[in-house]
Amino acid sequence: MHQPAPRPIRLTRAVVCALVAIGLGFLGLVALIYFKQHSMIYHPRPYDPSYAQVLPANGEEISYTLPFGKQTAFYIPARDNGRLPARLWIAFCGNGSLALDWTTILAGYPNSDDAFLLVDYPSYGKCQGYATIANMRASSDAALDMLAKRLGLSGEDLDPRLCTIGHSLGSAVALDFAARHRIQRVVAISPFTTLREEAACIIGGPLSHLLIESYDNRSSITEIRKRNPEAKIAIFHGTDDKVIPVRMGRELAREFPFIEFFAVDGANHVGVLSEAHDKIIHWMNN
């Protein structure tokens, strides 16, 4: 006659099954984060009809082809129609925005001598391909080279005029770009310290090491300082930012005292763009 298993054995089996289930669940979470991390970082979308009239009348598309597909950036020349802008601002958006969103943020820009090059991530807007750090570097460099050719200028002509501005992930791209060029000014809005440390805030420190690639703003700022000690950097960060905490912006400013830091009271991650609009524009022209 079959005898039921003693209670301690049944309990042990239950514990083992529970541990196996927890382990499998954890492995599933790890696999999900590892294989889906790109879609967690980048949120590409095309331009919808509402953007049809956004590019100013004097603006133009800058198209170029890279190994990963056709790319399209946007150039807004200086309003004085001079061939050489006093400053060329290269703008990079957040991971949920598009390059042409800068046209709203920069509305009413007072300096008619400045020009803007608005660059989308690969797979965003009118761009093909796949967004990675390497692909974005290639795309932004190619956009600048194509613009220089269109204007009949050399890199030496543009170098003393280059500035960058970026928001959120775009601030890391702006700093990364500045670390590879002789930039005069950088505006970083809502920056993280490193993408890995930002990921740790969301998924925890151990899981953040699953990140395949990570922008490192500390490293970029260090390189900017080496490349051009006279470069000016400003950080604008909302004190109510729940996406990238303001402590990260403050930490960068503490580590690099030459950075000008502006805390925007009560502003959240996106609201900082409108609430600090006038201060940002003023600093860009100061």
Positions of the model-derived regions?
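Short beta-strand/loop motif that positions the catalytic acidic residue
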Residues: 224-230, 234-237, 241
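Alpha/beta-hydrolase fold nucleophile elbow
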Residues: 153-168
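Membrane-embedded segments
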Residues: 68-146, 150
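Short alpha-helix in the alpha/beta-hydrolase fold that links the catalytic acid
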Residues: 104-105, 217, 245-254, 276
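Hydrolase active-site cap/lid region
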Residues: 171-224
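Catalytic histidine neighborhood in serine/cysteine hydrolases
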Residues: 250-271
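Catalytic histidine-centered segment of alpha/beta-hydrolase-like enzymes
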Residues: 243, 267-277
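An N-terminal hydrophobic leader/cap segment in hydrolases
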Residues: 14, 18-65
